[in-house]
Amino acid sequence: MVRLLSVALLALGLVGGMVAAQGSQPDALKQLENKGMPQLMAQLAKSKTCTNATMRIRKEWGDLPGAERKRYIAAVLCLSQRPSHYSPSVCPGCKSRYDDFVAVHMEFTPTIHNTGNFLSWHRHYTYAFESALIKECGYTGAQPYWDYGRWAQDPLNSPIFDGSDTSMSGNGENITHKSTVSPPGDGGGCLMSGPFKNMTVYLGPLASTADPRPKANPQVNGYGSNPRCIQRDITNYLSSRYGRTQDIVNLITKNNAIGPFQTAMQSTSGALGIHAVGHFVHGSQDPGGDFYISPNDPVFWLHHSMIDRVWTIWQSQDLSNRLMTIAGGTSMFGAGTRLQSLDDLIDLGNVEPTDKKWKIRELVSIVDGPLCYMYQ
């Protein structure tokens, strides 16, 4: 059995990862991932819905060849050109299928942040986006992720933010601005380069942290049409302090229960967690600094794929005890709300990729239920 697992792992190219393949030792996070991989593979062997043949393999953006990055970028832009599934009377600012994903996140934000379903909801949400790229835009790859630790010291010059045609676009124009989460950098304005330079966002703002604030939405609920650019102010201030590989490793190894783990990840215990770091590496600018509408910035999907990867690695360290476990309430406002249950349903509105709503317990594994992918 052990030999069969080893062969399967090697066949999928999941052990060691790209870093080791290039001749160096895998970093501490990859070592944890490798340690837990046999448990995931054993679970895959028992799955009735996921096989090696149907599995998607998610890779770090920097490990993707330029051609693969361009295919992903093209699919995201394709989704921003496809028609919305919302009625204009319900969501006037939903101009595209991409906007549908933003609107759904806006709708459910109070019940999917600092809650017991934070990880499972965003896991399925990211899978839904990945599925839309495949089914609606002909994408043949998987959702990439952003390994914060790998680029923590210099995110601006990383393959993710270097502004090239194979990046997720770079910094914003240098404008006078303040920052509410870290010292202001040399950006702050509209994207200056890269594939998403001319992308227009319409929804929000709702809870902007930008200063100066973006123009108000014509509707109180943020669903009105409010065209504007994507702004960024990329610095290493947060990533070099709180988003290093060791910070992620500490998150995984020092929190044995799901409650403390997700509390530390979401920064709800006072210290800055990696969830906040990923959102604010590009500053408190609009739209990324507004947690209701943060999916308006396409780098959101790489960020939350990494959040999901970290959860997966944490689970795999003790899968039998860390799979069917949950903690937290059902509202980010806390007081008076009931505790979340594994039998609660995950609602994705009109971006649900299947024909049903799934229970949280059906989404705790990445190789069972509707999900079928692994990280490399």
Short names for language-model regions:
Residues 1-24:
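Fungal secretory targeting signals
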Residues 20-376:
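Intrinsically disordered, flexible peripheral segments
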